C-alpha cells in the first residue's frame, strides 16, 4: 500500500487525473473562465507530479534503498568470499538498472504534457485527455502518436471516428509546462454552444481553427542552444504528411524553414509507434552530412529513434560495398574529382553507358558458347563431359584396389582431407565445366553478374582440365597397368601352392587366384573406360584456347571470387571512363559508380530497407534515385527537400516528377524572422511566407566587423562562405565542423553545402561568388540575426 497518503487523498488524486468528467453546465461555464482554468490546470499538474512521485519514484527509491542496504551488509560481513563479491556485483548492477529506470521518468517532471483535448461521444460521455511526448497509463497521459492524440493536430476536424466511437471536440488547448510549473495556456478551439447560450458564452469561446500558440512557442525557443522540439507546434498541414499511409511514396517540397526535417523525424516516430512490426533495421534515413546527423541527434533521442540507421548517401554506398567484401573507404585518395567527370557521372549518360558496356561484355562472353556458329561445338563438349561422368561412376564403383590405383587414398593433413592422386580433382573440374555449359545451353538467361561468376568457375576448371587432363588420364592408365602386373605376379605366386586331394593335385588358393583373374578383367575394362574419357579433350582444349584469346575473357578468368569480378567490371567500365578525364585513384564518388555498376550487372546488393527517407533530396540525382530503388526494390520512399536549395551544378534535381508522382508542398517559413524572410525574398526572389515573428534588421558589414557582430550573442553562431574564402576566417574563436558536430561555444565556419539543414541563432554570410540558390540557403540558416559580410 502507498505509504504516507490517506486513502481518501489518493482517491481524490485519481479522480482528478481521471479523463472521465461529469460535464454539467457548471463544468462548461468553468471552461470559459480563464482564472478558473489556470487554477484547474495548476491543480492537475500538481496531481500528476504527486502521482509520479507516489507510483514511480517512491517505489524505485525503496527498491534502491533496500538493495544498497543489502550491499552494505555484504561489505561489512565477516569472511568476505568470492561468492559475496559476485553477489555484490549483481546488487550494484540491479541498483544501476533501477536508477536508470527511475531516470526514464525525468521527462515527466520537465514537461509531462503539452496539450489537452476534451471530447464527447455517446458511449463514453465527456473525457479530457492530456497529450505528451511519452504516454503513461497511471499519469493519464496520452502519447502524441496515439490515434486519439493524432486528432489534436488536425485542426479543421472537430468531429472524427476511431474504431466504433464517434467523437466531437469540445476543447483543444495548448499548454506550456516546464519543470513542474504551468507557464501559460491558450485555447486553440473551444465550442460550448451546444450547452450554453450566447449570453452565457459572451464571446469567450474559441472557434478559430489555427494554431495561435505557434508563434509564441517558437519565439520562446529562438535562442535555445539545444535543438527546438516542435512536437507541440506541428500544424495540420504538416501532420497530414506525418500520418500518410506507411507504404505511400511521396515528395515533400518545402521552402527554407518549413520544418521538413522535423516532419521527417516525426513521421518516422509516428509510423514506428503505430506499427509494432516496423523495426529500426527496416528503415534507412539518408541525410546530407555528419554534422547534420549530430544536429538532429537530440530530437532523435526524444522521439526514440536512436536505433534507426542515419547515414549520408556516400556512407550508404560504402556499407553496400562492404557487404560485397569491398572496403572502398580505406582506399580514398583524398583528391578532388574533375567537375566535368562528376557532371558525366551523375547524368543519365553514365548509367546508359554502364548498361551498354555490361550488356556488351555479357553478350560477347555468352556468344562464345551459345551463338549459332559456336553452339554445335559447345553441345559436343557438353556431351563429352556427361559421358565422362558416366565413365567416372563406373570407376568409382570399381573394386578397392582399382579405385585406389586411379583415385588414390584419402588422408588427413590437419586442415582437412585430401586424395593422394589428382583424378578426383580433375573430374570435379569436368563437373564444373559441365554445369556451366549446361547452364549456357539449356537454362534461361539470368543476370550478367551470375553469368560472370559462373564463368570464373568454368575458366578455373577449364584451365585445370587443359593443363592436366591428358597427364592425369595417362597416369591413371599407367597405374592400372602397374596394378595389372602386380596382380599377375600375385597369381603366379599363388599358383605355386598346391595340395593333394585324393590322387589329384589341386591349387591351394584357387579362390584367390580366381578373384585376381577377375580383377585383371576389371583392370582392363576400367583402363579402356579411362581411355574413352581421354577422347574429346583436344576439342575442349581448342575451345578454351579461343576463349582465352577473346576480349576480356582472360581478365575475368583470373578472378578468384565475387570481389575480383567487381574489380574486373570496374576496370572495364568506370576506370576507363575516369581515364578520359585524366583521373587516377579512388574517389568518394566511386562508391556510387561501383554500386551502380554492380546493380546494373544484376547483383543483389544489401543492406535493403522497407522504408527509405531522404532529407535534402534535391541534391540527389535521378540516376541515384534509380539506384536506390533498384537496391531497395520493395521500399516506400519519402523524399524531403527544396528544389531552390540545389547548389551542385553537376548533381541533383530540377523537378520532383522524376522521383515520385505525389508531391506535398509547404511554403510557410517557421525558422526565420520577418526581417530575414523579407530580405531573402528581395535578394533572391524566394517563394515563402513568414509567420509574423519579428527580430533585428539584416545588416551589412565589413569583413573586419564579423567578430564584433557575434560578440555578446547567445545561441549557435556560424559564418557561411564559399570554400575558397574559408581561409579568411581561420582565426581565434572560429572553428570548422568536426565529426563530433557543431561547436556551441565558438563560431562555426561552414561552406554552403555543409550548412544545409542546420540552423543558428546568428549567421554572417560572406556571399562573394555565391549563386542565387547558395545565397538562399546561407541567408536562411539564421534564426534571428543575419549579417551579410562584404569586402576582403
Regions found by a protein language model. Name each.
Residues 281, 290-294, 298-306, 311-315, ...:
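Conserved helicase motor core of SF1/SF2 NTP-dependent helicases
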Residues 252-254:
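Hydrophobic anchor at the beta1->P-loop junction of P-loop NTPases
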Residues 257:
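Walker A (P-loop) phosphate-binding loop of P-loop NTPases
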Residues 1-243, 482:
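Extended, charged low-complexity regulatory segments
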Residues 246-250:
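Pre-Walker A (Motif I) flank of P-loop NTPase domains
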Residues 264-265:
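Post-Walker A alpha-helix
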Residues 260-261:
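Conserved lysine of the Walker
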Residues 272-613, 618-627, 635, 644, ...:
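Alpha-helical nucleic-acid-binding subdomain
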Amino acid at each position: 500500500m502507498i505509504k504516507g497518503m490517506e486513502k481518501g487523498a489518493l482517491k481524490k488524486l485519481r479522480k482528478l487525473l481521471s479523463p472521465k468528467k461529469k460535464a454539467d453546465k457548471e463544468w462548461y461555464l468553468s471552461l470559459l473562465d480563464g482564472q478558473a482554468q489556470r487554477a484547474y490546470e495548476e491543480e492537475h499538474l500538481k496531481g500528476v507530479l504527486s502521482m509520479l512521485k507516489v507510483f514511480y519514484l517512491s517505489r524505485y527509491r525503496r527498491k534502491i534503498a533496500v538493495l544498497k542496504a543489502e550491499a552494505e551488509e555484504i561489505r561489512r560481513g565477516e569472511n568476505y568470499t568470492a561468492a559475496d563479491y559476485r553477489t555484490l556485483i549483481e546488487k550494484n548492477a540491479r541498483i544501476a538498472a533501477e536508477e536508470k529506470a527511475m531516470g526514464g521518468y525525468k521527462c515527466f517532471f520537465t514537461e509531462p504534457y503539452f496539450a489537452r483535448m476534451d471530447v464527447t461521444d455517446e458511449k463514453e460521455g465527456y473525457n479530457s485527455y492530456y497529450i505528451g511526448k511519452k504516454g503513461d497509463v497511471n499519469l493519464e497521459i496520452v502519447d502524441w502518436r496515439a490515434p486519439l492524440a493524432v486528432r489534436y493536430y488536425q485542426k479543421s476536424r472537430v468531429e472524427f471516428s476511431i474504431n466504433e466511437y464517434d467523437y466531437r471536440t469540445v476543447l483543444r488547448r495548448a499548454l506550456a509546462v516546464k519543470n513542474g510549473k504551468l507557464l501559460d495556456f491558450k485555447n486553440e478551439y473551444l465550442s460550448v454552444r451546444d450547452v450554453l447560450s450566447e449570453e452565457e458564452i459572451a464571446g469567450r469561446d474559441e472557434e478559430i481553427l489555427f494554431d495561435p500558440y505557434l508563434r509564441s512557442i517558437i519565439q520562446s525557443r529562438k535562442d535555445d542552444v539545444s535543438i527546438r522540439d516542435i512536437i507541440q507546434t506541428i500544424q495540420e498541414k504538416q501532420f497530414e504528411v506525418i500520418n500518410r499511409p506507411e507504404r505511400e511514396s511521396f515528395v515533400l517540397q518545402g521552402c527554407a524553414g518549413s520544418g521538413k526535417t522535423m516532419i521527417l523525424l516525426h513521421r518516422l516516430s509516428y509510423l514506428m509507434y503505430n506499427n509494432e512490426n516496423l523495426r529500426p533495421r527496416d528503415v534507412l534515413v539518408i541525410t546530407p552530412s555528419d554534422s547534420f546527423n549530430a544536429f538532429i541527434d537530440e530530437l532523435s533521442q526524444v522521439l526514440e529513434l536512436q536505433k534507426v540507421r542515419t547515414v549520408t548517401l556516400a556512407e550508404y554506398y560504402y556499407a553496400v560495398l562492404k557487404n560485397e567484401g569491398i572496403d572502398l573507404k580505406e582506399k580514398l585518395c583524398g583528391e578532388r574529382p574533375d567537375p566535368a567527370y562528376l557532371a558525366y557521372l551523375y547524368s543519365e549518360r553514365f548509367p546508359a553507358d554502364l548498361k551498354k558496356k555490361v550488356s556488351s561484355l555479357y553478350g560477347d562472353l555468352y556468344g562464345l558458347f551459345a551463338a549459332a556458329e559456336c553452339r554445335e561445338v559447345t553441345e559436343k563438349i557438353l556431351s563429352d563431359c556427361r559421358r565422362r561422368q558416366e565413365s567416372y561412376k563406373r570407376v568409382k564403383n570399381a573394386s578397392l584396389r582399382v579405385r585406389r590405383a586411379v583415385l588414390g587414398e584419402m588422408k588427413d593433413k590437419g586442415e582437412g582431407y585430401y586424395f593422394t592422386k589428382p583424378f578426383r580433382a580433375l573430374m570435379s573440374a569436368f563437373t564444373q565445366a559441365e554445369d556451366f555449359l549446361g547452364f549456357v545451353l539449356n537454362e534461361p538467361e539470368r543476370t550478367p553478374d551470375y553469368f560472370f561468376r559462373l564463368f570464373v568457375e568454368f575458366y578455373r576448371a577449364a584451365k585445370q582440365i587443359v593443363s592436366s587432363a591428358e597427364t592425369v588420364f595417362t597416369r591413371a592408365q599407367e597405374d592400372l597397368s602397374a596394378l595389372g602386373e602386380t596382380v599377375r605376379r600375385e597369381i603366379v605366386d599363388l599358383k605355386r601352392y598346391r595340395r593333394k586331394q585324393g590322387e589329384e593335385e589341386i591349387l591351394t588358393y584357387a579362390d584367390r587366384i580366381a578373384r585376381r583373374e577377375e580383377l585383371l578383367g576389371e583392370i582392363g575394362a576400367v583402363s579402356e573406360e579411362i581411355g574413352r574419357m581421354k577422347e574429346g579433350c583436344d576439342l575442349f582444349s581448342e575451345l578454351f584456347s579461343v576463349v582465352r584469346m577473346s576480349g576480356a575473357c582472360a581478365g575475368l578468368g583470373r578472378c578468384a571470387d565475387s570481389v575480383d569480378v567487381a574489380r574486373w567490371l570496374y576496370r572495364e567500365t568506370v576506370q576507363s571512363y575516369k581515364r578520359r578525364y585524366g583521373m587516377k585513384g579512388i574517389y568518394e564518388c566511386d562508391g556510387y559508380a561501383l554500386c551502380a555498376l554492380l546493380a546494373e550487372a544484376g547483383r543483389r546488393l544489401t543492406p535493403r530497407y522497407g522504408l527509405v527517407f531522404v532529407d535534402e533530396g534535391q541534391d540527389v540525382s535521378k540516376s541515384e534515385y534509380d539506384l536506390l530503388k533498384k537496391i531497395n526494390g520493395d521500399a516506400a520512399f519519402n523524399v524531403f527537400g527544396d528544389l531552390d536549395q540545389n547548389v551542385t551544378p553537376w548533381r541533383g534535381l530540377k523537378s520532383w516528377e522524376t522521383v515520385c508522382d505525389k508531391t506535398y508542398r509547404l511554403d510557410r517559413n517557421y525558422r526565420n524572422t520577418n526581417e530575414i524572410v523579407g530580405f531573402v525574398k528581395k535578394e533572391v526572389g524566394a517563394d515563402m511566407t513568414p509567420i509574423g515573428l519579428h527580430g533585428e534588421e539584416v545588416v551589412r558589414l565589413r569583413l573586419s566587423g564579423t567578430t564584433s557582430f557575434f560578440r555578446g550573442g547567445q545561441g549557435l553562431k556560424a559564418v557561411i562562405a564559399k570554400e575558397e574564402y574559408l581561409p579568411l576566417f581561420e582565426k581565434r574563436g572560429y572553428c570548422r565542423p568536426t565529426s563530433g558536430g557543431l561547436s556551441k561555444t565558438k563560431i562555426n565556419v561552414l561552406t554552403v553545402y555543409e550548412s544545409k539543414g542546420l540552423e543558428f541563432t546568428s549567421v554572417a554570410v560572406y556571399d562573394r561568388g555565391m549563386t542565387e540558390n547558395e545565397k538562399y540557403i546561407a541567408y536562411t540558416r539564421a534564426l534571428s540575426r543575419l549579417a551579410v559580410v562584404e569586402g576582403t
